[in-house]
């Protein structure tokens, strides 16, 4: 049996799903597709950005309720949620550490469980050092992304690239 860990950078995956007409990235359906025959998906990790609410009590409560709903839905789909709180920047923008949190969680879990593969749903070059380190440990990484959006350094580090649009077509992730 082949053992895999599925790690999802949720924000860009949700964007791709919405562009295709779906409401969200179908975590459970993609996980089941990855599992296929003779594959054990040991864990599914997914980042969930907690947005910064306005400073009034109603906005804070609404923000927390939305986060909790999405967290519960992801957990019901079999994912372990990695909370990534956003911070307000002085210029009014927001910064979150979701990539870094996913890198740390994925790397530590992979080094502990020693799967044959990590399936990484992400396209950002920030993940390339993690993929190289996994490779040094004998763990191959399949990257799930749009090939035209995939950072070149992540493409070089990956064992293989799977087109996210092909996967969403297979699982019925709208079109």
Model-derived regions: residue spans:
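Domain-level signal for Mg2+-assisted phosphodiester chemistry and nucleotide/NA-binding surfaces
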Residues: 1-98, 140, 149
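Nuclease catalytic cores that cleave nucleic-acid phosphodiester bonds
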Residues: 62-175
């Amino acid at each position: 049996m082949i053992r895999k860990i599925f790690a999802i950078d949720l924000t860009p995956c949700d964007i791709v799903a919405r562009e295709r007409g779906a409401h969200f990235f179908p975590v459970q359906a993609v996980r089941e597709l990855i599992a296929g025959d003779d594959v054990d998906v040991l864990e599914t990790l997914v980042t969930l950005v907690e947005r910064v609410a306005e400073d009034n009590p109603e906005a804070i409560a609404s923000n927390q309720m939305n986060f909790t709903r999405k967290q519960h839905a992801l957990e019901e789909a079999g994912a372990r949620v990695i909370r990534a709180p956003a911070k307000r920047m002085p210029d009014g923008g927001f910064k979150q550490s979701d990539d870094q949190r996913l890198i740390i969680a994925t790397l530590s879990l992979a080094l502990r469980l020693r799967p044959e593969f990590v399936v990484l749903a992400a396209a950002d070059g920030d993940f390339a050092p993690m993929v190289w380190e996994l490779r040094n440990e004998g763990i191959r990484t399949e990257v799930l992304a749009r090939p035209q959006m995939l950072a070149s350094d992540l493409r070089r580090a990956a064992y293989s690239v799977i087109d996210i649009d092909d996967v969403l077509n297979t699982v019925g992730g709208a079109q």
